[in-house]
């Protein structure tokens, strides 16, 4: 009987839809934001979800390992074939003081025309000169290998060198300067010459200034490592953030802020009473001593004002806190009272009756106003003169009036 096939996993489309759903949930309401922080957060979430939860540092370590492997392969190939590279000489250096690289490999075909030296004895001078050894302190050879001529030569040189040897342990400033600037080498010569009485060697344990700067430079740490380090330093015994702990923390912070403000105000009042006015604003000065406002009679151009003492009301600045309890809120909830908000079935009939009563009342008031005015005589009317405009037509004909249009 063949073995059972393993259950097929979810398809790629299903996985992609799940990832898109997760991205949409985490970035809800942020896609239309144009801020730089929001866009960076969206890109970070997309990378994390698409990577399937892999830590970004793992990918970085993998790339680093691949790069180191390639460099190791290149070094191995170079050690096998040993290709001769074209020599480059620094500016100001004599090429004859450098041994030809092709000549050492037996590949130089230029002979005497080669600009580099073919003297292999220069190999010893190519070695870096030690900064901790003074070349004038060389020990003499053993006397067992000397002959008479060598002994005489050594005696003469010994007495002559005693006059030229350094007589102090102070280090030469030119030597220190050359070492600090990386100019010290086989071809370096002291400006004081061979007769320089100062030491041309560093004492044991001496640290150069350039090395001190490298040691003082702080080691750089990546953001991911810093976050992981801080998280590990927190430990596991931490308070979980809930509604109750947050409200308690907020209450404590507000009380601390209020106490700090009161203490600061008391300190400023104490300083002001002692005559110290540094750090006190003008408003605080007048609030501490309102008598400063009444500084004399009002002059021309001054504004009138009134002075009064304001009583401090601590109740205005009091803060009340109330903890939210979901169980108490659910018990206090009750059904909404609908009295006065639900329309009755006879509302239309009541409106018609009220309108009829209002119309009847208005008609009665209008009839009462018309009857007294029609029955009462008009005793206050002025008498009318019938002959007032009899001769007015003749007077109008005698007037010479010019037409305004002319």
UniProtKB/Swiss-Prot annotation:
Ranges of Basic and acidic residues composition bias in the record: 12-28, 56-70
Identification of the protein by name: Zinc finger CCCH domain-containing protein 15 homolog
Keyword Repeat: yes
Chain positions covered by the region annotation Disordered: 1-70, 336-382
Skewed-composition ranges (Low complexity): 1-11, 38-50, 352-364, 372-382
UniProt-listed SUPFAM superfamilies: CCCH zinc finger
Residue ranges covered by zinc fingers (C3H1-type): 94-121, 166-203
Segment forming the signal sequence: none
Keywords, ordered alphabetically: Coiled coil, Metal-binding, Repeat, Zinc, Zinc-finger
Gene3D superfamilies xref list: 6.20.400.10, Zinc finger, CCCH-type
Coiled coil: 57-82
Entry-linked InterPro entries: ZC3H15/TMA46_C, Znf_CCCH, Znf_CCCH_sf
Molecular function as annotated in GO: mRNA binding; zinc ion binding
Family that this chain belongs to: Belongs to the ZC3H15/TMA46 family.
GO cellular component: cytosol
PROSITE patterns: ZF_C3H1
Organism name: Drosophila pseudoobscura pseudoobscura (Fruit fly)
């Amino acid at each position: 009987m063949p073995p059972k096939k393993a259950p097929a996993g979810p398809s790629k489309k299903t996985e992609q839809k799940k990832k898109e759903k997760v991205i949409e949930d985490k970035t809800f309401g942020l896609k239309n934001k144009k801020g730089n922080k929001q866009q960076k957060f969206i890109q970070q979430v997309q990378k994390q979800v698409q990577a399937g939860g892999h830590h970004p540092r793992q990918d970085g370590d993998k790339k680093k390992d691949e790069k180191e492997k390639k460099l190791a392969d290149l070094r191995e190939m170079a050690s096998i074939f040993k290709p001769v590279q074209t020599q480059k000489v620094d500016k100001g250096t004599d090429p004859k003081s450098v041994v030809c690289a092709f000549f050492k490999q037996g590949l130089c075909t230029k002979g005497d025309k080669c600009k580099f030296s073919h003297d292999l004895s220069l190999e010893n001078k190519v070695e870096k000169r030690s900064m901790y050894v003074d070349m004038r302190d060389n020990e003499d050879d053993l006397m067992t290998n000397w002959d008479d001529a060598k002994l005489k030569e050594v005696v003469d040189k010994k007495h002559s060198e005693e006059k030229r040897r350094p007589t102090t342990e102070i280090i030469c400033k030119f030597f220190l300067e050359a070492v600090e600037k990386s100019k010290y080498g086989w071809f370096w010569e002291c400006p004081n010459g061979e007769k320089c009485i100062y030491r041309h060697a560093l004492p044991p344990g001496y640290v150069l200034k350039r090395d001190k700067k490298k040691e003082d430079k702080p080691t750089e740490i990546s953001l991911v490592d810093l976050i992981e380090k801080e998280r590990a330093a927190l430990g596991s015994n931490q308070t979980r953030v809930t509604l109750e702990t947050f409200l308690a923390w907020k209450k404590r912070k507000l009380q601390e802020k209020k106490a700090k403000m009161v203490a600061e105000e008391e300190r400023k009042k104490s300083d002001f009473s002692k005559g110290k006015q540094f750090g006190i604003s003008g408003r605080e000065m007048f609030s501490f001593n309102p008598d400063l406002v009444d500084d004399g009679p009002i002059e021309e151009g001054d504004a009138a004002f009134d002075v009064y003492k304001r009583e401090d009301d601590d109740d205005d600045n009091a803060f009340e806190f109330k903890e939210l309890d979901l169980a108490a809120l659910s018990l206090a909830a009750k059904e909404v009272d609908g009295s006065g908000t639900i329309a009755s079935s006879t509302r239309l009939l009541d409106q018609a009756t009220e309108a009829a009563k209002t119309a009847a009342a208005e008609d009665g008031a209008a009839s009462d106003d018309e009857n007294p005015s029609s029955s009462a005589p008009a005793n206050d009317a002025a008498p009318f003169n019938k002959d007032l405009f009899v001769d007015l037509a003749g007077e109008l004909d005698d007037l010479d009036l010019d037409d305004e249009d002319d």
